[in-house]
């Protein structure tokens, strides 16, 4: 399997992506990587490495990088020879099976549509991630910011794609699908949400369970949670912020303790237990958002991802390719559209 990596994208660029690439090669013996970016920034880091698997890594030169604050429309116009564009073109030319980038989200979405095209029947691809919940499973949640405004038909498309992802990546045989809403009653919510709900009730191949509220996000009440990108992005980042504060507080509280030795032991045990419970929700463990709805696999890593988190994104790309997620989304969508047209 060959994956193209945008080595220059994200807040840290090659400082994170190159070491992460080397570690991924040591973890996955059958993996080959195409590291796209400025050789002057990449090669010095590689020169200091003694990692195994260097023979499975190729540096592909790219002159420039799309900045994180660039407007997507402008970035796309001047994207030629950027690390992101070159990485995507490697998929189009057949040299790579997937692409991973921590770069500008809007530019990645626009360029992916331009270079790789959407699956037939998908209006716009969506950003999705696999969010852990308290029942030791994971929930597919989409959209996470690729589409700020969505009509009911788009939400239905997201539901279909999320259901396929849950089956293929998580192995859920009959995924429960829900819409994120402000209440569980059918009369609640905006027109587009209620419209999507009515359509989903009519699709027999989708196990639609109705509405789920944000306070149930980590409770495991659904396998797929669908929302527009505006709500999804705010919801995810709020949850990630809270989890990081909790983990940071648990780690730092030991230094502030002035209890007697017995209470220190009890307090330490409780703190370690809580840390273990909350650490499963650490955003680093589930980094890597799929751009589902494209004809090939593209994974968006968090811009501030550390080395461990970027490896998680590479792993997500491998799983998507191995399980033929884009092809199966296309098949499922064509089946649903065919039934609805009869």
From Swiss-Prot:
Pathway membership, UniProt: Lipid metabolism; phospholipid metabolism
Chief place where the protein resides: cytoplasm
GO terms, molecular function: phosphate:acyl-[acyl carrier protein] acyltransferase activity
Catalysed reactions listed for this entry: a fatty acyl-[ACP] + phosphate = an acyl phosphate + holo-[ACP]
EC number: 2.3.1.274
Keyword Cell cycle: no
NCBIfam families: plsX (TIGR00182)
Subunit structure: Homodimer. Probably interacts with PlsY.
Function: Catalyzes the reversible formation of acyl-phosphate (acyl-PO(4)) from acyl-[acyl-carrier-protein] (acyl-ACP). This enzyme utilizes acyl-ACP as fatty acyl donor, but not acyl-CoA.
Name this polypeptide is given: Phosphate acyltransferase
Organism: Blochmanniella pennsylvanica (strain BPEN)
């Amino acid at each position: 399997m060959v994956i193209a990596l945008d080595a220059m994208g994200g807040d840290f660029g090659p400082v994170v992506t190159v070491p992460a690439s080397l570690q991924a090669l040591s973890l996955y013996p059958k993996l080959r990587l195409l590291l796209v970016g400025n050789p002057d920034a990449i090669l010095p880091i590689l020169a200091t490495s003694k990692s195994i698997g260097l023979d499975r890594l190729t540096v592909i030169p790219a002159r420039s990088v799309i900045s994180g604050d660039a407007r997507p429309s402008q970035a796309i116009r001047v994207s030629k020879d950027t690390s992101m564009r070159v990485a995507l073109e490697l998929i189009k030319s057949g040299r790579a099976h997937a692409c991973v980038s921590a770069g500008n989200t809007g530019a990645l979405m626009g360029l992916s549509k331009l270079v790789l095209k959407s699956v037939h029947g998908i209006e716009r691809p969506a950003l999705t991630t696999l969010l852990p919940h308290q029942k030791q499973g994971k929930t597919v949640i989409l959209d996470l910011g690729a589409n700020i405004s969505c009509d009911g038909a788009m939400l239905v498309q997201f539901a279909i794609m999320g259901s396929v992802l849950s089956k293929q990546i998580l192995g859920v045989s009959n995924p429960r699908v829900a819409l994120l809403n402000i209440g569980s009653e059918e009369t609640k919510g905006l027109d587009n949400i209620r419209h999507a709900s009515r359509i989903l009730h009519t699709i027999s191949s989708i196990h639609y369970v109705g509405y789920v509220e944000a306070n149930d996000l980590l409770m495991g009440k659904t396998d797929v949670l669908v929302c527009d990108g505006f709500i999804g992005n705010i919801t995810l980042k709020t949850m990630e912020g809270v989890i990081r504060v909790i983990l940071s507080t648990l780690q730092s509280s030991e230094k502030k303790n002035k209890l007697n030795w017995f209470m220190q032991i009890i307090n330490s045990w409780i703190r370690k237990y809580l840390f273990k419970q909350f650490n499963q929700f650490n955003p680093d463990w589930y980094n890597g958002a799929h751009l589902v709805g494209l004809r090939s696999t593209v994974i968006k890593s968090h811009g501030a991802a550390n080395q461990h988190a970027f490896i998680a994104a590479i792993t997500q790309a491998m799983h998507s390719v191995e399980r033929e997620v884009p092809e199966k989304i296309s098949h499922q969508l064509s089946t649903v559209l065919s039934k609805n047209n009869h």
